[in-house]
Amino acid sequence: MTAAATVAALVLAGIVAGATPRLTVQPTSIARGGVVTVSGKGCRAGDLAYLISPPFVGNAFVAHSVATRARSNGSFSRRVHIRTSIHAGRYLITARCGGGNLGVSARLRVY
């Protein structure tokens, strides 16, 4: 398969799935050692979604990542513990599923 055909297949798969990727975090501001819920959509049903951010406790894909499985509608949600040793600041949360980046992010403030 050529590179153009691969890209076209990926674009078509996204259109067929009809899911505009989304990623949210609640609450958006948390104390060190707290727990947040990261939710999103845009994965294929059954895919593992990897949630990645420096404050996260976990090593599912890379350091500071956790995993959850996408539901039949492509949505996912996971409660995530925040490291107690992280510096206060603003952090980006990203997600991967189906072998690539979801292409969206959420922001979290840790105090």
Language-model region placement:
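Extracytoplasmic/secretory-pathway segments with low complexity and glycosylation-like composition
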Residues: 1-111
